[in-house]
A protein has these predicted regions:
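N-terminal flexible/basic segments that precede or flank functional cores
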Residues: 1-27, 95-152
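Short basic helix-loop element that most often maps to the first helix and adjoining turn
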Residues: 3, 30-49
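Short, contiguous strand/loop micro-motifs
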Residues: 19-20, 30, 60-64
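Recognition helix of helix-turn-helix/homeodomain-like DNA-binding domains
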Residues: 50-69
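DNA major-groove recognition helix of helix-turn-helix/homeodomain DNA-binding modules
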Residues: 71-87
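Short C-terminal boundary/hinge segments that cap the last helix of small helical domains
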Residues: 82-98
C-alpha cells in the first residue's frame, strides 16, 4: 500500500502541473490550422515541412478538428512547425487524491447506508451523526486499502 501511495503522490504532482490547462479552450478550427494561419504558413508549406502533400496536410487539419487525428500525426505536424505536442490527463476532481477520496466515499456511503437500512428494519436505527461518522471511517479504510472496486 505504501508503494501505491508514493506512486499516487508522484503522479499527482506531475498531473497538477497540467491543472492550469483545464481552462484552455481548443480553437474551433483546431490547433494546427490556428497556428499555421497565425504564422502565415500555407498548406503547401505545412505539407512540405511534414513531407506530405497539401491535401494530406489539409486532411490532418480536418481530422484534428473532428477529433480523429492520431497523436503520432499531431506530433509530426508539431515538429514541422517547430513545436512540441503536450499530452496528458487532468483529474476532474482537481487531484488524484480527491478523485480517490470521492470514489471511496461513494462506496463507503453505499456500504454504510445498506447496513443502516438493515438496522432500521430491526428497529436499531442510527442517528445521522453516527451514519456520517461511519461513512468517514469507512472512506478512510477504503483509501488505505485501495481496493479494485474503486474503479467498478
Amino acid at each position: 500500500m505504501k508503494k501505491n501511495k508514493l506512486q499516487i503522490e508522484q503522479l499527482s504532482k506531475k498531473l497538477n502541473s497540467y491543472n492550469s490547462l483545464q481552462e484552455l479552450v481548443v480553437p474551433s478550427i483546431g490547433w494546427i490550422k490556428t497556428i499555421r494561419t497565425s504564422l502565415g504558413m500555407s498548406l503547401e508549406q505545412l505539407g512540405g515541412n511534414m513531407g506530405v502533400t497539401r491535401q494530406s496536410a489539409q486532411n490532418l487539419e480536418k481530422r484534428e478538428k473532428d477529433g480523429s487525428a492520431t497523436l503520432k500525426a499531431l506530433e509530426g505536424a508539431g515538429r514541422s512547425i517547430d513545436m512540441k505536442l503536450v499530452y496528458g490527463f487532468v483529474p476532474v476532481d482537481g487531484s488524484l487524491e480527491q478523485l480517490i477520496e470521492r470514489k471511496a466515499k461513494q462506496i463507503a456511503t453505499q456500504i454504510v447506508m445498506r447496513t443502516s437500512g438493515t438496522m432500521k428494519l430491526e428497529d436499531q436505527e442510527n442517528s445521522e451523526e453516527r451514519i456520517e461518522k461511519a461513512i468517514e471511517e469507512r472512506t478512510a479504510e477504503i483509501i488505505d486499502e485501495m481496493p479494485k472496486i474503486l474503479w467498478d
